[in-house]
């Protein structure tokens, strides 16, 4: 799997308000774990560890 900032179908990150929200989001997508992380310029967003390949991770390009 891959570590990274989990993204929705529009290449946008998920805003993180609580670590348990991100952890649940990541494990629901079959990742190992998740937590809040500060990422300039996006702010506090969800970081996931060991996501399976088909789950989108924030890539280069704009959030649509």
Swiss-Prot record:
Gene3D superfamilies: Knottin, scorpion toxin-like (3.30.30.10). CDD domains: neurotoxins_LC_scorpion. Residues 2-64 form the LCN-type CS-alpha/beta domain. Pfam families: Toxin_3 (PF00537). GO terms for molecular function: sodium channel inhibitor activity; toxin activity. Expressed by the venom gland. One of its GO terms (biological process) is defense response. Keywords: Disulfide bond, Ion channel impairing toxin, Neurotoxin, Secreted, Toxin, Voltage-gated sodium channel impairing toxin. It is found in: Secreted. PROSITE patterns: LCN_CSAB. Disulfide bonds join 12-63, 16-36, 22-46, 26-48. One of its GO terms (cellular component) is extracellular region. InterPro entries: LCN-type_CS_alpha_beta_dom, Scorpion_toxin-like, Scorpion_toxin-like_sf, Scorpion_toxinL, Scorpion_toxinL/defensin. It comes from the Eukaryota. Its main location: secreted. Has the structural arrangement of an alpha-helix connected to antiparallel beta-sheets by disulfide bonds (CS-alpha/beta). Belongs to the long (4 C-C) scorpion toxin superfamily. Sodium channel inhibitor family. Alpha subfamily. Inhibits sodium channels (Nav). This is Neurotoxin BTN. The lineage of its organism: Eukaryota, Metazoa, Ecdysozoa, Arthropoda, Chelicerata.
């Amino acid at each position: 799997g891959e570590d990274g900032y989990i993204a929705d179908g529009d290449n946008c990150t998920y805003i993180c308000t609580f670590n348990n929200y991100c952890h649940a989001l990541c494990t629901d997508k079959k990742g190992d774990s998740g937590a809040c992380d500060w990422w300039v310029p996006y702010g506090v967003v969800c970081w996931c560890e060991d996501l399976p390949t088909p789950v989108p991770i924030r890539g280069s390009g704009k959030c649509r």
